[in-house]
Amino acid sequence: MGDNYSTYLLDIEGTVCPISFVKETLFPYFTNKVPQLVQQDTRDSPVSNILSQFHIDDKEQLQAHILELVAKDVKDPILKQLQGYVWAQGYESGQIKAPVYADAIDFIKRKKRVFIYSSGSVKAQKLLFGYVQDPNAPAHDSLDLNSYIDGYFDINTSGKKTETQSYANILRDIGAKASEVLFLSDNPLELDAAAGVGIATGLASRPGNAPVPDGQKYQVYKNFETL
């Protein structure tokens, strides 16, 4: 079914890895680190430049503001920078590994042109794919899939994922025709936006994903083995 496409654009959460990974692993890891980051912040600390962009001097208020952004899942670019910094430490220390589905790992390895589009920052995307839990190895082993991925897009590079113009921007940047691209996501609003510029779409139906009311109008993929 995917043989007609030369280029693949992939969402992350709910598509190539469990949707629970962000809310049950990444977000708690970050929120647990926030008090320490804020209270120990000094002018020469690594996160000082990021925290200063919130323009909140009171540390208690700053901490509350950051945690509120996380709780409401606000796509704030400053928050994304801070999360990227914290998650980098987690990945590099071995405390975090991304549970990418085995069929998605195989898919990324065997397809010639694969791009990633996520609301998470490009930096966070590269970290995730750089520290993937190897399904065929002991728990401490990880895979680096970045060499198999041709490019990364986020809300800063391309725009919001629910806006058609964002996909037009991506087509321009990768130099592809809409008819050559298949976009896979668990979010129907994103699929509709991509379809608005003529990109073919597929609905990722993974364990734990929310039911899609009009799911029958999309080509549904429970895994990527058929692609």
Curated annotation (Swiss-Prot):
Highest taxon above the source species: Eukaryota
InterPro entries: Enolase-ppase_E1, ENOPH1_eukaryotes, HAD-like_sf, HAD_sf
Pathway connected to this protein: Amino-acid biosynthesis; L-methionine biosynthesis via salvage pathway; L-methionine from S-methyl-5-thio-alpha-D-ribose 1-phosphate: step 3/6; Amino-acid biosynthesis; L-methionine biosynthesis via salvage pathway; L-methionine from S-methyl-5-thio-alpha-D-ribose 1-phosphate: step 4/6
Keyword list, A-Z: Amino-acid biosynthesis, Cytoplasm, Hydrolase, Magnesium, Metal-binding, Methionine biosynthesis, Nucleus
Residues engaged in binding substrate: 118-119, 161
GO cellular component labels: cytoplasm; nucleus
GO terms assigned for molecular function: acireductone synthase activity; magnesium ion binding
Enzyme kind, highest EC tier: hydrolase
CDD domains: HAD_EP
Details of cofactor binding: Binds 1 Mg(2+) ion per subunit.
UniProt subcellular location: Cytoplasm; Nucleus
A single BP term in Gene Ontology: L-methionine salvage from methylthioadenosine
Protein name per UniProt: Enolase-phosphatase E1
Native source organism of the sequence: Saccharomyces cerevisiae (strain YJM789) (Baker's yeast)
Lineage: Eukaryota, Fungi, Dikarya, Ascomycota, Saccharomycotina
